[in-house]
Amino acid sequence: KFVRSSPKPYATNNKDKKIAIEFDEFIKLEKTSEKVVVSPPQLEQPDIKASGRRVLVNLMDSLKPNTTYTIDFSDAIVDNNEGNPLGNYSFSFSTGETIDTLEVSGTVLAAADLEPVKGMMVGLHVDLDDSAFAKKPFDRVSRTDSRGRFTIRGIAPGKYHIFGLMDGNQNYLYDSKTEMIAFSDSIIVPSMEAAMRQDTLWKDTVTIDTIKTVGYTRFLPDDIILRAFKGINDRQYLSKSERDKENHFILSFS
């Protein structure tokens, strides 16, 4: 379990690009390039490694002012002995006076067969112009898991457009018609509410001891559905060339 970190979790006014997170046992990292996501997205990939009981993160991009940073480890952190994952662990700090804590979540399905889409980047744009998806990197970002599920954390109050992108060149914007994409016409307005749920305490592995109601914070929307499809490659290319005369030729394009 988590012991301490530098900076502290949810620290504000942090200007240090190096983060150290310590746990109570030796750990290792698995598939960081596939599982770990930093938000806002980093154009220069961060250096993330395990060292004994610590995870060390070095952010290469310059820190943006008054911005909440979230490092979502998913299940990349595992104990060194048995390989048990520390599931859904994330770490946040802010470069400003306050830290943003809103979240949205949902599922990406393939439009053709409604199967879950794994490994798709899902991001938010505060710029509501439809062209922002092709011109600007995401403002906040996450990645779908094997069930197609995603959670985008560290969101400020406001209105957003949401998009999915199978980002082959890792620039967090739609600049290739061959990339699989997903989007919603609806404007996303993150919010939260107090909610209750049933929690079970077990006497042993087969006997329920107590069922109690516990309070928690529910982040909304938590049921976004995005349908992914591959864009149509409408780029022109030379399909045929003819030269019927010495001083005359014909070029045909798609």
Kindly give the residue locations of the regions a language model identified.
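Acidic, low-complexity Ser/Thr/Gly/Pro-rich repeat segments typical of extracellular/periplasmic
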Residues: 1-147, 151-154, 159-168, 177-192, ...
